[in-house]
């Protein structure tokens, strides 16, 4: 390894758990990483607008990889920001509406919700958290899909319709299910690992000099890709199995 490494941290379940603050020990550890000349990045499935200054960025990071590898910035400057193509949106949205799937479209600046299905949310805390975190940026899906600027879709699908949604989505998307019927739909070819790879190429960082820290199913690819993959003690079994170390 070179003298400078790049460390990529997942957010939910890694930096902090639902309803809890970021541990002071974690804040100190990230500060120490940077003091020693290394780079620290957020690497999350959340879209960029869902990575607020408080409580996340105030910790002190060099950059952000968001939306499962579709967005990245470094030292306040945009590196890349990809969006779902309109024809892809026009293909999947009718399926989500027909199956009464609660879905939100996550973009760099806005989170869009469907007024007809928002009431089908299985976990109200998730919707409440978005409203609290980004007031003014949580808006109804525009009637004209041309106005949508989204990178990924988060879904809560009725269990009996899950197979239908998965079958319809697999043409253009990869589906990451955190539970049987709660998950993320991300355009094919984009993962946290692809985001890290692209950041490394742009910044001249060797893959061997990367460290990834995560806990969930959408962290597996980056734990495998990084020079060193670290799974949290509370991680899912797939994450633990692929990691080099478990905390």
Where are these regions (language model features)?
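Short, well-ordered beta-strand core segments
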Residues: 7, 64, 102, 229-231, ...
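Residue-level signal for inorganic ion chemistry
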Residues: 33, 153, 223, 244
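Asp-based, Mg2+/Mn2+-dependent phosphohydrolase catalytic module
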Residues: 206, 225, 230-247
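Short, structured coil segments at secondary-structure junctions
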Residues: 57-60, 67-68, 168-172, 225-226, ...
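Asp-based phosphoryl-transfer active-site loop
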Residues: 3-20, 223
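Conserved acidic, metal-coordinating active-site core of Asp-based
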Residues: 95, 99-213, 217-221, 234
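Active-site phosphate-binding/coordination module
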Residues: 19-121
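Non-catalytic pre-domain segments flanking phosphatase-related domains
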Residues: 1-9, 28-31, 35, 205
């Amino acid at each position: 390894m070179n003298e400078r490494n790049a460390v990529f941290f997942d957010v939910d379940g890694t930096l902090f758990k639902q309803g809890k603050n970021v541990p002071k020990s974690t804040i100190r550890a990230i500060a120490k990483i940077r003091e020693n000349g290394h780079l620290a990045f957020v690497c999350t499935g959340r879209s960029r607008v869902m990575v607020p200054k408080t409580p996340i960025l105030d910790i002190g990071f060099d950059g952000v990889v968001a939306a499962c590898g579709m967005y990245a910035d470094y030292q306040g400057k945009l590196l890349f920001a990809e969006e779902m193509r309109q024809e892809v949106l026009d293909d999947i949205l009718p399926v989500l509406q027909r199956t009464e799937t609660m879905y939100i479209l996550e973009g760099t600046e806005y989170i869009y919700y469907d007024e007809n299905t928002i009431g089908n949310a299985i976990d109200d805390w998730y919707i409440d958290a978005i409203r609290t975190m980004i007031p003014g940026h949580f808006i109804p899906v525009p009637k004209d899909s041309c106005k949508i600027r989204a990178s990924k879709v988060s879904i809560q699908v009725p269990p009996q319709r899950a197979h239908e949604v998965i079958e319809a989505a697999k043409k253009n998307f990869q589906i990451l299910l955190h539970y049987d019927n709660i998950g993320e739909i991300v355009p094919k070819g984009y993962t946290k690992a692809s985001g890290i790879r692209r950041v490394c190429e742009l910044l001249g960082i060797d893959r061997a000099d990367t460290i990834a820290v995560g806990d969930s199913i959408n962290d597996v690819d980056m734990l495998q890709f990084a020079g060193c993959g670290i799974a949290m003690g509370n991680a899912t079994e797939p994450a633990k199995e692929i990691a080099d170390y478990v905390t």
